[in-house]
C-alpha cells in the first residue's frame, strides 16, 4: 500500500504553512504502508498539474491532500469539493479567479471517498479535536481537492482520495488576537491517526 500525502507552501504573507510542516514530519511508513510526502504550490491550476505528475510518478493507492484553515480550532476532514474557484485573495502567482469553473466536464461537486467519519473518530481517540467539514472554501484548497477527485473520477477509478484541513500553528497567531491554533505535534499525530483509520478501513475490505 502506498499513500501520497501533500501539504501546501506558505501563502498570504505567512512564513510557514502548517500543512506541509506536519506532512514532512510524518514517518516514511505507517503500519507497513509507504508514505510519500510532497509540497504543492499554492497556485490555481499549477497545484493540480503538480499533483497529477506525482500520481503518475508514484502510482499511489491513496492520496491525502492537507491544507491550512486559519481560524479553525480543530482538524477538519473535508466531505466535498465544488467545481468553482472564487478567490478573495491572490494565490502565490497573483491569480484571483472569480466564479470560474475548475473543469468544464466535471460534476458540480465530488465527495471524498475516504472513510471520513472513521477518520474523525480515530483522531478523537487520539485526544485531538476533529470534525467533518462540509465546505473546503473556494480557494486553492478546494481547487486541489476538486482536482484530485476529478482525476479519480476520470482516470484513476481505483484510487482513494480526500482532503484534511489543519489549524494555524501557535507561532502564526502571536499577532492574531483570539485566533485558535494547534501544536505541530498534535497536527502530525492527527495525520498519523487519520492514516491508520484509512488503512484499517481498506485492509478490512
From Swiss-Prot:
Family, per the entry?
Answer: Belongs to the peptidase C15 family.
Q: What is this protein called?
A: Pyrrolidone-carboxylate peptidase
Keywords, ordered alphabetically: Cytoplasm, Hydrolase, Protease, Thiol protease
Primary residence: cytoplasm
- Cellular component terms (Gene Ontology): cytosol
The task this protein performs is described as: Removes 5-oxoproline from various penultimate amino acid residues except L-proline.
| Localization | Cytoplasm
Asked if the Swiss-Prot or TrEMBL record annotates the protein with the keyword Phosphoprotein, the reply is no
- HAMAP family assigned: Pyrrolid_peptidase (MF_00417)
List the catalysed reactions: Release of an N-terminal pyroglutamyl group from a polypeptide, the second amino acid generally not being Pro
From the UniProt record, which GO molecular function terms apply? Answer: pyroglutamyl-peptidase activity
User: Do you know which PANTHER family this protein is assigned to?
Assistant: PROTEASE FAMILY C15 PYROGLUTAMYL-PEPTIDASE I-RELATED (PTHR23402), PYROGLUTAMYL-PEPTIDASE I (PTHR23402:SF1)
**Annotated EC:** 3.4.19.3
Chain coiled-coil ranges:
none
Family annotation (NCBIfam families): PRK13197.1 (NF009676), pyro_pdase (TIGR00504)
Asked if Cytoplasm is a keyword of the record, the answer is: yes
An example GO BP is: proteolysis
